[in-house]
């Protein structure tokens, strides 16, 4: 992405915004004084927008089904209890410095039959308004960069305990919307991706609990094309991700219930590779000397597969990329909800660490959820003290045990 030098100050603001979300889709592995930074395009695709998940450190691949299951694990939609549902999720961003950057997400689903469920989602991330000026202060116009994704979900319940699901999406990233011709234009980037997921839920009999179950889920998301912003530029990988988790749910008595979840995430994107010549000069590995780093020449699928074993530090480096989420939820009469979680990202995956808290209220068909993020490291982050709000509804018959 190249801009006129005259607008460098404004571009630095945009760069800061992009880097703040890029931190969600990058990791840093240090070796021999080098930083092996993994970056992707459209990192907003990994942001969990719903307040229920956010209140539990963004667990979601194995929690009970809800309106936002399409993001976390589309296979869960087949296990949702009501016939129809929809929700809106709102997440303000960088509130410490501006009030016009936010991520909004809308979800909806409908049961086609007791075993088949379809859904749709829309995600819109606005990067605010940027006023471009030249070196003399002359007005060059206003840009309102944004990113957008339109998604469809489908889930099929194979048996009482097992379901599978898939999602498909169109992604648009417009980082120069409205910029004047005095700035080198950045064409909109587009990409297509799919998710494949599975969800297993088994009832258990444990101690004095009235009811209990164990859920296990897996979702490989954003498998798809690279995204490119110019004809001459190199396309970027989108944030392909693998999530694997388990959730235990327990009903203590007719009024009290709880859940506890553990989830692991790994970004399935190649790690940059470096070489050092006889003079000690360090550069990206470029075996065919075409000025394009070898890892960038990998296709999406090849890059995804090699990401399991391409770290310079071997298996230790691969394990250092894994993000851990721990979350819990307590419910009273399935009406009042209290949530908490712990998010741990190793230095090799970005270094974010925070605790979360959340509240929920369900009244008739409506549900309102709120979450709050509190960092626990000295390093300041644009995510500090972030909140998310969700409102949704579910209607129709209870299809909890209606299958086949």
Predicted feature locations:
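Bacterial Sec-dependent N-terminal signal peptides
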Residues: 1-28, 246, 266, 328
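Subset of outer-membrane beta-barrel
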Residues: 26-404
């Amino acid at each position: 992405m190249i801009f006129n030098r005259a607008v460098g100050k404004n571009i630095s603001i945009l760069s800061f915004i992009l880097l703040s979300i890029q931190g969600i889709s990058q990791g840093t592995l240090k070796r021999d004084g080098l930083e092996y930074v993994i970056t992707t395009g459209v990192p907003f695709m990994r942001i969990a927008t719903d307040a229920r998940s956010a209140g539990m450190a963004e667990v979601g691949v194995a929690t009970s089904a809800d309106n936002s299951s399409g993001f976390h694990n589309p296979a869960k939609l087949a296990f949702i209890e009501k016939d129809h549902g929809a929700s809106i999720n709102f997440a303000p961003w960088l509130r410490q410095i501006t009030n016009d950057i936010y991520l909004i997400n809308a979800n909806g689903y409908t049961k086609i039959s007791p075993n088949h469920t379809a859904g749709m989602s829309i995600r819109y991330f606005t990067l605010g308004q940027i006023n471009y000026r030249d070196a003399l202060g002359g007005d060059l116009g206003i840009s309102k960069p944004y990113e957008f994704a339109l998604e469809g979900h489908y889930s099929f319940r194979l048996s009482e305990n097992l379901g599978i699901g898939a999602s498909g999406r169109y992604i648009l990233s417009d980082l120069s919307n409205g910029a004047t011709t005095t700035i080198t234009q950045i064409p909109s980037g587009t990409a297509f991706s799919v998710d494949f997921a599975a969800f297993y839920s088994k009832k258990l009999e444990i101690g004095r609990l009235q009811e209990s179950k164990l859920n296990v889920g897996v979702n490989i998301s954003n498998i798809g094309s690279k995204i490119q912003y110019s004809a001459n530029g190199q396309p970027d990988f989108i944030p392909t991700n693998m999530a694997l988790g388990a959730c235990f749910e327990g009903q203590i008595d007719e009024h009290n219930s709880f859940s506890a979840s553990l989830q692991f995430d790994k970004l399935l994107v190649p790690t940059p590779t470096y070489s050092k010549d006889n003079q000690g000069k360090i550069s990206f590995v470029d075996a065919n000397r075409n000025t394009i780093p070898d890892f960038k020449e990998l296709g999406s699928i090849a890059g995804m597969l090699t990401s399991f074993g391409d770290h310079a530090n071997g298996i230790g480096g691969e394990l250092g990329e894994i993000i851990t989420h721990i979350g819990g939820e307590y419910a009273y009469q399935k009406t009042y909800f209290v949530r908490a979680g712990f998010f741990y990202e190793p230095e090799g995956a970005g270094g974010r660490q925070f605790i979360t808290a959340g509240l929920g209220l369900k009244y008739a068909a409506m549900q309102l959820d709120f979450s709050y993020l509190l960092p626990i490291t000295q390093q300041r982050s644009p995510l500090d003290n972030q909140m998310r709000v969700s409102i949704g509804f579910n209607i129709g018959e209870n299809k909890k045990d209606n299958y086949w």
